[in-house]
Amino acid sequence: MARQGRYGRMSRGSTIVEFAIALLVFVTLLVAIIEFGWLFFIQHTLQYATREGTRLALVGRTVNDPSGNPMTRVDSIIRTIRDASSLAVRPDAVLISIYPVSASFGDPANWENIQDAGEPGDYMRVRTRVVHTFFTPLIGGFFPDGRITLQAEGTYRNELFDE
């Protein structure tokens, strides 16, 4: 039978304590990877949806609603963006602004509330925003109210399409 050393009694259970500390660090890193992975997925999807909306917008095309009726250009752009972003976020959570930009490519006043698809040849901007709430307070604690606003935009020139 092996004899316990002088410190044998004091080291009893130290393995489980070390494992618990290592597990805590590992789980924290795993949660952070999942949280930020989801955040980047939403950002990428929002950028993709914005690009899809601008592609439709710049050629002056429209889409049909579910019952087959043609939609306006603005509604077509909004629907395209919401459909393309629906995998990552609720479609109604995406805030969409469509507006003409000035010659200096500056934003007009109150651009957040504008939805105007513009005329042929106009320089336009589509800006989308969504508020992301983190799943865990562990990561959310680093952000105000545990949320962050993700934004994507596309600037383009309308082609000289027939209206």
Regions found by a protein language model. Give the residues of each.
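Short, conserved structural patches
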Residues: 2-3, 51-163
